[in-house]
């Protein structure tokens, strides 16, 4: 059978929260089969399982909330776990926010690969899309469609000089594209004016040119420029992959986003789960039964 995965060993890192600016200790630990991804607040001795229903705030990031306990900015770490096929993991945090690291999923990919990956004696579960599902909010929309693989496309639309030279749309079919090489390094981005307003409201206190692409009225301020020509839209794809992993399983289907964000992504997940005829949970006995997007080596 195609088995679930967890980490071989625990691994620790230190960073700062993007919005709080607080120092955060992060430890990724192996978890038993069928546990899922569980965030544990070591400062409060409380835990929250990563599920679509646990999302309680999506204004600036994806935030899990349960009985007043919060864990925010989970999407980059979840994207890395999804990209590496990790089904079960304890995420221990000393504060309320996952550290922003360099603003991408790449540091989390490095941590997981350094800890090692092991298979477990339980079948890996997939969610297969059977019927189209869509959520529309004005000129923004998100949709799932049936697809025998995993494909994510996204369109952004910003009225700003920097984006005139940018690819506004990207599509990633993971049967032929490496998450690690082509998506994981895309950093979060923000506009200087918005960052100044956020800081005035005591938010984005940990943000800097070391962990985000910052854009002023005319240009990218980071001296090293962009990691990909289409890094802005690639980061939206990275975010979406993390948000979609709140299904608790790898997805067999395609996702399309147009000018959407964390809120619409979560609304789409909830709508999908409400429509039981639109999806099914599946497992696979043999590797050659898997959609090609999932039979690639982890190190690709």
Swiss-Prot record:
It comes from the Bacteria. Its EC number is 3.5.1.108. GO terms for biological process: lipid A biosynthetic process. It catalyses: a UDP-3-O-[(3R)-3-hydroxyacyl]-N-acetyl-alpha-D-glucosamine + H2O = a UDP-3-O-[(3R)-3-hydroxyacyl]-alpha-D-glucosamine + acetate. The active site is at residue 262. Pfam families: LpxC. One of its GO terms (molecular function) is UDP-3-O-acyl-N-acetylglucosamine deacetylase activity. InterPro entries: Ribosomal_Su5_D2-typ_SF, UDP-acyl_GlcNac_deAcase, UDP-acyl_GlcNac_deAcase_C, UDP-acyl_N-AcGlcN_deAcase_N. Zn(2+) binds at residues 76, 235, 239. The keyword Hydrolase applies. The keyword Metal-binding applies. Its cofactor is Zn(2+). GO terms for cellular component: membrane. Pathway: Glycolipid biosynthesis; lipid IV(A) biosynthesis; lipid IV(A) from (3R)-3-hydroxytetradecanoyl-[acyl-carrier-protein] and UDP-N-acetyl-alpha-D-glucosamine: step 2/6. Keywords: Hydrolase, Lipid A biosynthesis, Lipid biosynthesis, Lipid metabolism, Metal-binding, Zinc. Catalyzes the hydrolysis of UDP-3-O-myristoyl-N-acetylglucosamine to form UDP-3-O-myristoylglucosamine and acetate, the committed step in lipid A biosynthesis. Belongs to the LpxC family. This is UDP-3-O-acyl-N-acetylglucosamine deacetylase. It comes from Halorhodospira halophila (strain DSM 244 / SL1) (Ectothiorhodospira halophila (strain DSM 244 / SL1)).
């Amino acid at each position: 059978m195609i088995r679930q995965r967890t980490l071989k060993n625990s691994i620790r890192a230190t960073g700062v929260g993007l919005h709080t600016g607080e120092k955060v200790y992060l430890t990724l630990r192996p978890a038993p089969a069928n546990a899922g991804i569980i965030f544990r607040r070591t400062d409060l001795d409380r835990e929250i399982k990563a599920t679509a229903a646990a999302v309680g705030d999506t204004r600036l990031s994806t935030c899990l909330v349960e009985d007043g306990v919060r864990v925010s900015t989970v999407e980059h770490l979840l994207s890395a776990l999804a990209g590496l096929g990790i089904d079960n993991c304890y995420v221990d945090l000393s504060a309320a926010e996952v550290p922003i690291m360099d603003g991408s999923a790449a540091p989390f990919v490095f941590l997981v690969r350094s800890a090692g990956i092991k298979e477990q004696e339980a079948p890996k579960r997939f969610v297969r899309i059977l019927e189209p599902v869509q959520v529309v909010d004005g000129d923004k929309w998100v949709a799932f469609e049936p697809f025998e693989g995993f494909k994510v496309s996204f369109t952004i639309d910003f009225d700003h000089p920097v984006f005139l030279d940018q690819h506004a749309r990207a599509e990633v079919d993971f049967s032929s594209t490496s998450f690690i090489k082509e998506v994981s390094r895309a950093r979060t981005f923000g506009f200087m004016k918005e960052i100044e307003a956020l800081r005035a409201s005591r938010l984005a206190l940990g943000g800097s040119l070391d962990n985000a692409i910052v854009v002023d009225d005319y240009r990218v301020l980071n001296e090293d420029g962009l990691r990909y020509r289409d890094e802005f839209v690639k980061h939206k794809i990275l975010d979406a992959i993390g948000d979609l992993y709140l299904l608790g399983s790898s997805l067999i289907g395609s996702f399309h986003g147009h000018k959407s964000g964390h809120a619409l992504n979560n609304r789409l997940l909830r709508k999908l789960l409400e429509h039981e005829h639109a999806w099914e949970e599946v497992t696979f006995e043999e590797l050659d039964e898997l959609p090609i997007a999932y039979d690639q080596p982890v190190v690709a």
